[in-house]
Amino acid sequence: MSNVRISEIANELGYPSKEIVEKAQELGLKVKTHSNAVSLEEAEAIYEYVQTGVIPDKFKKKKSEPKAKKEPKKETEKEPAKKEEKPKTEPKKAATKAEPKPEKAKAEPKKEAQISEEKPKTEPKKEEPVKVEQKPAEAPKPKESLADVTQKRRGLVIVKKKKDYEAPAPIKEEKKAEAAVTNISDFKSMFSASDENLARKKKKEKKVTVVSKKDSAEKMDLLGGSDFGDIVLEDEDVVVLPDFSFKTPAPTPMQRTKQPNAMKTTVNNTINSFGEGGIQRRARKKHKKPENKQNSEAVTSINIPKEIRVYEFAEKLNKQPSEVIGKLFMLGMMTTKNDFLDEDAIEILADEFNVEVNIIDDQKEFDYVAAYEEEIKDDENLQPRAPVITIMGHVDHGKTSLLDYIRKSRVAAGEAGGITQHVGAYMVNKNGRNITFIDTPGHEAFTAMRARGAGVTDIVIIVVAADDGVKPQTKEAVSHAKAAGVPIIIAINKMDKESANPDLVKTGLAELDIMPTEWGGKYEFVPISAKTGMGIDDLLEIVLLQADLLELKANPKANAKATVIESSLQKGRGPVATIIVENGTLHVGDTVVAGVAYGKIRSLLDDQGRSLREIKPGECGVIVGLSEIAEAGETLIGVKTDKEAREYAQKKAEYIRQKELSKSTKVSIDELSAKIAEGELKTLPVIIKADVGGSLEALKASLEKLANDEIRVNVIHSGVGGITQSDVALASASNDCIILGFNIRPTGEIKEKAKESGVEIKTYNVIYNLIDDVKAILGGLMSPIIREEQLGQAQVRQVIHVPKVGTIAGCIVTEGTINRGAKIRLIREGVVVYEGLVSSLKRFKDDVKEVAKGYECGVGIENFNDIRENDYIESFKEVKEKATL
């Protein structure tokens, strides 16, 4: 005798698996999860206990009655009366509430053909007892099907079914029954009548019949054809058996009288095929993936990762991807099964499917930073470290000049256009103590760079020009510093100028909640001059004092943890990265991983290009030896082995690759309709190459913002390093693609190949020049702006009707001029009546080209004669202008 899973019992009763597990445990059964199995006797006891709330006596007697059940199961047709003794009550109890009189169960489709023939007459007599528990007397038959079907999990479903489905006189439709055997579509139509009766009767039995009606009906249709060779089973455990026990009788009352033996043979053969694995082999041949074994179990709570695709979400819910896609479509989102779902979409879907969702972090397996933090969280070997200072502010306010004076260098003079376009990290020694400075660009395009600088710093110095006051990037710098939660020091620069006004700076910053200490605030304002050096020593003293208050500490003996500030590709060195060490010490020969890049450090360099043996906490330097260019802002961690570093990097790379492949293609229905109506969105395909990763990131972000409803920039490829032949080939394959280079120059060979391929290469060393040129190109692709220019106006004084010519308006010009062939609009009482062209223009009897203000004329309007006195004729022309972003 085979066992039955708790999940199947829960499905048939319509209860959550968790409740059924609890009920089974109350009965003393050793079950813990929904996947545990129990014997048929125990399952029947659970059925009775759930339906009545009373523990069955037979179960209390340690299964003394199950034997009686086993015997009747063996003799299905000859001994129906015996089975009615005790098995009757248990299956029936599930259905008693819904069916006061078992005799009305004519349309019950859940009986086996042969069982229903003999049983119906005897059972009605035994149902004399008034008690609800005695009505189940009819249920014994289901147990017979249980005996036959016990080899598979659904056998238990039959326990709750009736067997008095004999009442209908099926003889009239024998011919239809025969047709049904050969024609599946006809067979389906025969189900309708009995299914309707069944539906009415089943309403009350809702909990007991939770089985998927749709699936079972469709599969029973296939059974009617008796051609099992073509059946493709989605799950051998779930599909066929429950359908035989629930749907066989209803559709074929004629079949019972005409072909009982054939039906019995078919059922037995099908059941036997399960054990032999025949159907399973057939399913493999059809390449049909089996559904989840838990398919019939209602999912109420699931754990899903932060990043999950549509088909993965469907699998978690035991649903088809098409169901999830359909729900999203109804919400106005066009998705494919490989698209990622964001948290909002997950919450909406969870509500739609009535499930509780618990979002978990799926990046733990390659989250080397979390693993590192776990190792050092109780670190006690802490020592003071050098402070990291970030200099921020508006473009051209003197940030780099300040750092140049401190370092005694001339970095600003070497920057293109006199503006910083890279993040630089420098070391300065003051009073025997090291201070690390990060110089960030002030141009608006470098927002991400400034945010990155603020994120790794201990103190922020915001430089404001005394003669210029607070500017947009000044406000942005304040926002970044506040978001990072770091102390702020204000340096009022250019105090050597006559137009310097420090109060202007203080007033502007006070509006941003940055109050100076002399005004009762908590922020230090230091007047300086990067040109003369005035106040710079005071600034450094305040920096060191602030660092002491912060008590900055790190463990120099731990594995290194650093942040990548900038990265690039250098000839002779390969991928290099500028880093700032936050904890631990980085040595030459250490194995490190930074995102998708990993490797063993071949050399360390300081900001002057000199070799180093190690970089301590709070210090900066350049590392050489990574496998590829590390992304700016990535965290770099020292690991023990090359294998560990490679695994982290490869897992992260695979994750990123999969995410790229399934980039969301979501678009609202309204947007989709608009695109179809107005034509395809115009795009400018570009390839971007830059000298360092930070500049590349800034360029991409700036160009992607250059978009509107009509046009956008499509970055088809970007990378760090020079322009290569593959870049030219890619641009050639893409229509109208241009290559944009920043701080790089193509070689003669590349220029020649680009010329042959018809590819345009543009190079720049100032970022806003590049952006302005792209704006101009986009403007040329956009539809021109049509501007209307007024030419003149005339008042109709008299209407003249000329045979074979039409109506002529006798006018006097009140403004400007009226020209022949010009566009005009006829205005009556302030409302435009008609727009057209001047077909004829005469002064007295002469045709003229134009009539000036104050003169009378006759005006004929093309294809329009409804002219009245006191109408106004307004003349204008349309001027097309180039659109700009």
Curated annotation (Swiss-Prot):
Extent of Basic and acidic residues compositional bias: 65-146
Region (G1): 393-400
Entries under InterPro entries matching the protein: EF-G-like_DII (IPR053905), IF2_II (IPR044145), IF2_N (IPR006847), P-loop_NTPase (IPR027417), Small_GTP-bd (IPR005225), T_Tr_GTP-bd_dom (IPR000795), TF_IF2_bacterial-like (IPR000178), TIF_IF2 (IPR015760)
Cross-referenced SUPFAM superfamilies: Initiation factor IF2/eIF5b, domain 3, P-loop containing nucleoside triphosphate hydrolases, Translation proteins
Gene Ontology MF term list: GTP binding; GTPase activity; translation initiation factor activity
PROSITE patterns: G_TR_2, IF2
Annotated tr-type G domain residues: 384-553
Ranges for region G3: 439-442
A GO-annotated cellular component: cytosol
Ranges annotated as biased composition (Basic residues): 281-290
Localization: Cytoplasm
CDD domains, A to Z: IF2_eIF5B (cd01887), IF2_mtIF2_II (cd03702), mtIF2_IVc (cd03692)
Region named G5: 529-531
Region span, G2: 418-422
Keyword field: Cytoplasm, GTP-binding, Initiation factor, Nucleotide-binding, Protein biosynthesis
Residues that bind GTP: 393-400, 439-443, 493-496
Region (G4): 493-496
Region (Disordered): 55-150, 269-300
Summary of the function given for this chain in its UniProt record: One of the essential components for the initiation of protein synthesis. Protects formylmethionyl-tRNA from spontaneous hydrolysis and promotes its binding to the 30S ribosomal subunits. Also involved in the hydrolysis of GTP during the formation of the 70S ribosomal complex.
Similarity comment: family membership: Belongs to the TRAFAC class translation factor GTPase superfamily. Classic translation factor GTPase family. IF-2 subfamily.
Protein's name according to its UniProt entry: Translation initiation factor IF-2
